[in-house]
């Protein structure tokens, strides 16, 4: 979303004005914006690539992750879910770690929702979450 808004408003206007707001008349980018349609498409590409790998003979495909971690931002969790749903076993634990966030800044897009909202966001997903470092 930030590259889109940088392009739409210009970097200086983004930093001076728009980054402090939750959105405009068209888009919401804070706090903790959802994954954009482009992000969903990219995550689906990751999923499809892994699915292709796993259809190869076992000795050719890479091993599945043994530890799954994510930042606490909803867009990160959505990327993880789209990428790995149906590949990792149902109920796989996702370790949510605060320090995995790309930025802990003052811009609204860098702020995250509450633990309750994160749990609600993940409620219908096939993964269990374990939140660390709050």
Predicted regions and their residues:
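Short linear capping/connector segments at secondary-structure termini
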Residues: 97-102, 132-134
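Acidic, glycine-rich loop-and-strand cores that form catalytic or ligand-binding grooves
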Residues: 111-134
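Short alpha-helix plus adjacent loop in nuclease-associated cores
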Residues: 101-111
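Active-site-proximal alpha-helix that buttresses catalytic centers in soluble enzyme cores
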Residues: 1-92, 96, 105, 116-124
